[in-house]
């Protein structure tokens, strides 16, 4: 009977397509405002038997358990998020609800599943099974909550845990985000074009009571990185149904996509009776308007293809001894960020995160070629499946001719402290390497064996000539233990018998980066490089940016170059499936302030991270996209030569 009805609907749909030369309202005519309950709503309102508070029931891995006293231990599966009785969980550690979840976690299938969904691929068979579990998890949480209330005999409101939303954060703080064009290393960074306010797209219509997925046209009201605040056509100045979405998401399309894909365009029911002829309204509104290029989704997909692959071997800085490099193997690639596992790590827990364009990674043999210190790896531990990453994959540094007036050992300069990125310090050139590389030491805090010397290229934007901080009104950190304050370079050079490095040898190029003070972005905490956090640009000195991590003290700020591959547009984590660290709660900030006053970071703990990572929990951000297009008559588009397309009416 159901099949007969579907065939009849399909036949009726085909007939309407023949009558309508535009093909726009193929789903609208047959979907008049019908307030009768749909099959989808019937399915969603599934009856669930109430759970007695005295005898909560937990279904775990196919088994049903009860705990009359409500005191039995609970556990949450680290793979699928299922809540259940701890004793029924798998393995001694009770971290997983089943053998399947344990193995899936180890094989990193969760990450692959997330990336597949973000890229618009259909879910795997396992993913479909996991989608059925949230109901069980809710039942378990409800049962645990009821049991807790009974034991405490105190009426307390449940704590609501909400995920961080960039859209709400931008709106509530009335701030702006750095545009995607500021990040050339990010997806679409080089082809963002004229994607701006006013561009029209087609997205799912969420203001509809129809049982099927329908679409409507929206305009970009505000841009925040990859995210856009959209407003449905027809709402004029009414912002009541405005919503945020990621423009690069799988549900966002150029105007014309619905017509070519046979998807219905249906106006939101809130304004459904505002116009009698919606077709004429859209033609008038959209003729001459801009939309996304037809191959926009293809460009997004192509920009998220990365040349580095798992099992590739590279040389990377040793996070325990900054003066040397070690061999590491690419374990995974997310959004261009590499998780590198040091080759001699047997349990694969000794790792390091960086972007594929980072100056901290190099091809195998780089250290030997320039005279850099290198920790040798036991050749017996090298796995046959690993292979050296091709040299052309790495970022090329500027070719420099080291003449007679080149940097020399003992010369003084100013440099960002790699162990305290909020400080620019008095520094000394300790060794001159080949190809323009220098080993730099921070005066007053160097290890006796030079293990904390750091390698900077002469063109690095992280080293500066003597006097840079004074000229730009930046606080210069004097050598530890130096008592003649305020610090004066002239006196210090005379006392140490040193000379300043020539100003002409430093990088003076300042690109038109587009950053402005107050702009929001996502930034890597370089002291714990696996974390990407909500951040703000608080100061700009030429090409140098002062990055503040929202919710944390200023002492955690970091100086970063404007072209750093550790900065990303708002929405990058959501797009790539990476985990975004939200601003720290005020309580954590206060406690952290007290801790920081009592205990300063030790110089012997490089890249261990600030205390803030103990208070933050990694949270998965799921992509929430929306799709957009237009009628066939307006699907003919003209490129304006700059990335966006104009919509023209068919003659």
UniProtKB/Swiss-Prot annotation:
Any Pfam family hit: MBT
Gene3D superfamilies found in the cross-reference section: 2.30.30.140, 3.30.60.160
Record field: compositional bias (Basic residues): 597-610
Binding site for Zn(2+): 77, 80, 97, 101
Keyword Calcium: no
Subcellular location, principal: nucleus
Listed name of the protein: MBT domain-containing protein 1
């Amino acid at each position: 009977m159901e099949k007969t009805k579907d065939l009849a609907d399909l036949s009726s749909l085909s007939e309407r397509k023949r009558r309508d030369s535009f093909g726009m309202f193929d789903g609208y005519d047959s979907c008049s405002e019908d307030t009768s309950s749909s099959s989808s709503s019937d399915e969603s309102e599934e009856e669930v038997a109430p759970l007695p508070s005295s005898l909560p029931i937990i279904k775990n891995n196919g088994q049903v358990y009860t705990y009359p006293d409500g005191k039995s231990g609970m556990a949450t599966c680290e793979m699928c998020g299922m809540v259940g009785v701890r004793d029924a969980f798998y393995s001694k550690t009770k971290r997983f609800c089943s053998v399947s979840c344990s193995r899936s976690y180890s094989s990193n299938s969760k990450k692959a599943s997330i990336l597949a969904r973000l890229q618009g691929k259909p879910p795997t068979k396992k993913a479909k099974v996991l989608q059925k579990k949230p109901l069980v998890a809710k039942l378990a949480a409800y049962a645990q909550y009821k049991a807790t209330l009974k034991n405490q005999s105190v009426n307390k409101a449940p704590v609501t845990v909400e995920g961080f939303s960039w859209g709400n954060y931008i709106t509530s703080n009335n701030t702006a985000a750095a545009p995607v064009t500021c990040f050339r290393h990010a997806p679409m960074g080089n082809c963002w074009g004229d994607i701006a306010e006013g561009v029209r797209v087609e997205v799912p219509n969420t203001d509809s009571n129809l049982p099927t997925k329908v679409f409507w046209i929206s305009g970009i009201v505000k841009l925040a990185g990859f995210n856009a605040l959209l407003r449905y056509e027809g709402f004029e100045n009414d912002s009541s149904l405005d919503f945020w979405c990621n423009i690069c998401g799988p549900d966002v399309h150029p105007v014309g996509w619905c017509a070519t894909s046979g998807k219905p365009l249906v106006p939101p029911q809130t304004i459904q009776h505002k116009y009698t002829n919606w077709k004429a309204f859209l033609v008038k509104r959209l003729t001459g308007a801009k939309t996304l290029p037809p191959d926009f989704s293809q460009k997004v997909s192509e920009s998220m293809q990365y040349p580095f692959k798992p099992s590739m071997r590279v040389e990377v800085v040793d996070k325990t001894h900054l003066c040397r490099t070690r061999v590491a193997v690419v374990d995974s690639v997310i959004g261009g960020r590499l998780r590198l596992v040091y080759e001699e790590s047997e349990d694969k827990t000794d790792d390091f995160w960086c972007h594929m364009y980072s100056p901290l990674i190099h091809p195998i043999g780089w250290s030997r070629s320039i005279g850099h210190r290198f920790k040798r790896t036991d050749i017996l531990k090298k796995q046959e499946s690993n292979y050296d990453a091709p040299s052309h994959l790495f970022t090329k540094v500027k070719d420099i001719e080291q003449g007679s007036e080149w940097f020399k050992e003992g010369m003084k300069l100013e440099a960002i402290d790699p162990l305290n990125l909020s400080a620019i310090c008095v520094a000394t050139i300790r060794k001159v390497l080949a190809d323009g590389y220098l080993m730099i030491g921070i005066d007053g805090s160097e290890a006796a064996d030079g293990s904390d010397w750091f390698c900077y290229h002469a063109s690095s934007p992280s080293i500066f000539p003597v006097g840079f901080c004074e000229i730009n009104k930046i606080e210069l950190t004097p050598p530890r233990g130096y008592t003649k304050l305020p610090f004066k370079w002239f006196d210090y050079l005379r006392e140490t018998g040193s000379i300043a490095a020539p100003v002409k040898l430093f990088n003076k190029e300042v690109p038109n980066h587009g950053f402005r003070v107050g702009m929001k972005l996502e930034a890597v905490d370089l002291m714990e490089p696996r974390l990407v956090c909500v951040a703000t640009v608080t100061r700009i000195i030429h090409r140098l940016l002062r990055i503040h991590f929202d919710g944390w003290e200023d002492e955690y700020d970091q100086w970063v170059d404007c072209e750093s591959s550790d900065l990303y547009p708002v929405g990058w984590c959501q797009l790539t499936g990476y985990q975004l660290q939200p601003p720290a709660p005020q309580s954590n900030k206060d406690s952290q302030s007290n801790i920081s006053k009592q205990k300063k970071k030790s110089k012997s703990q490089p890249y261990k991270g600030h205390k803030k990572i103990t208070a933050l929990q990694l949270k998965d951000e799921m992509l929430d996209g929306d799709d957009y297009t237009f009628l066939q008559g307006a699907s003919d588009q003209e490129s304006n030569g700059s990335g966006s397309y104009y919509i023209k009416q068919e003659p």
